[in-house]
Amino acid sequence: MKIWKIGVVGCGNIAETVYIPQMEKIKNARIVAVCDSNGMRAKQIAEKFGIEEYYDDIDEFLARSEAEICMSISSIIGRHEVNMKILDAGKHLYSQKPFAPDVEAATRQIELAKRRHVVLSTAPVHRNRPEIRLAKKLIGEGMIGHPSLIKMDVTHGGPEYYQYRDTDPS
């Protein structure tokens, strides 16, 4: 069985509490490096999870790490630029949402992935939620006609999350 070498770009709270712990459960994947513009944060995450390599520079990370697949969990503001660098380096990419700031930027990422013959994927957002799947089924079966507008509010049902964080929010 092939073991995929994973690189994580962005070592904030979501990486620490969701992505990295979940990746550790996947038998055919191993995180080989992490990268964050905050070098101390990258080092802390690497030490916490026993990851051998950490970087504070995306270009060095892409040139030196053995990552075949990169998970872009970087800040929303810089994510498009990070994603373009990952794709241009010929690495497969899984990006946190939103993967691009606008349609034009998304199109550039898609076209670059095609030229480099790599897979570009992004977080599924809400499409796998049961209520969304049911709505898709009902629309597909013609049960509710042809929708012209869909409005949805989603909450997590608890206290405001960010004020209770106990890790670096970057």
Language-model-detected regions and their locations in the chain:
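N-terminal Rossmann-like dinucleotide-binding module
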Residues: 1-49
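Hydrophobic residues in well-ordered beta-strands that form the structural core
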Residues: 15, 55, 95, 120-122, ...
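Receiver (REC) domain switch-region micro-motif
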Residues: 34, 70, 150
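Beta-loop-alpha module in the N-terminal Rossmann-like domain of NAD(P)-dependent dehydrogenases
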Residues: 49-112
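Rossmann-like NAD(P)(H) cofactor-binding subdomain of soluble oxidoreductases
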Residues: 78, 98-100, 121-128, 133
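Rossmann-fold dehydrogenase core element
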Residues: 108-125, 145-149
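Predominantly a Rossmann-like dinucleotide-binding segment in NAD(P)-dependent oxidoreductases
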Residues: 126-170
